[in-house]
């Protein structure tokens, strides 16, 4: 299967900067303890002292008090790595000169994630239909259209297959998110150009 990002399954994402370079696996283990979030994923994001932390903890619950509870749990778990940063400093997203603490946070609910999945599916399907119609009108043979769409679909299938087979082994982030969908649409564009022009 594919490693679906927060955009597609729902969850909370936090971008945190630390005082020193930090091990993503150490933070993942720390936040995955039952008394913290139960499960979390941390990945190096940009510099070696910055992590992107994702969790599905209480994703179905909403409200300011839940968000506050989760930020406090995050802070309390990370405080040994924050070099004297107070909770107020940690959560202040308006400080542009912040050296340590929370830089960004957002939440995607499962409902929004389902909407994004559907929109992505329709975007890819729509592009294949447009390709089919363009070639049908341009070359006046449905067989050419079918062949071109099959070639484009084949190219997309190869990219999806490579992602599906290798995301666990790669040392970098290979999650399926909105940027991945944009990349798939780019593959469709290049494949179409190669099929029709060449």
Language-model-detected regions and their locations in the chain:
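A structural signal for conserved, well-ordered secondary-structure elements
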Residues: 1-198
């Amino acid at each position: 299967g594919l490693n679906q990002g927060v955009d597609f399954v729902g969850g909370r994402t936090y971008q945190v900067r630390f005082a020193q370079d930090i091990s993503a696996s150490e933070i993942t283990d720390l936040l995955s303890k039952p008394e913290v979030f139960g499960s979390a994923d941390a990945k190096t994001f940009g510099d070696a002292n910055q992590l992107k932390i994702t969790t599905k903890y209480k994703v179905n619950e909403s409200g300011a008090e839940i968000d506050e509870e989760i930020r406090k749990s995050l802070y309390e778990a990370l405080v040994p790595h924050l070099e004297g940063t107070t909770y107020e400093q940690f959560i202040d997203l308006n400080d542009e000169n912040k050296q340590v603490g929370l830089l960004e946070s957002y939440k995607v609910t499962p409902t929004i994630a389902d909407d994004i999945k559907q929109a992505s599916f329709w975007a890819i399907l729509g592009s294949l239909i447009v390709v089919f119609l363009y070639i049908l009108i341009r070359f006046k043979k449905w067989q050419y259209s079918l062949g071109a769409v099959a070639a484009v679909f084949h190219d997309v299938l190869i990219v999806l297959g490579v992602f599906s087979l290798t995301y666990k082994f790669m040392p970098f982030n290979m999650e399926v998110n909105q940027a991945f969908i944009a990349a798939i649409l780019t593959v469709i564009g290049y494949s179409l150009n190669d099929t029709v022009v060449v």
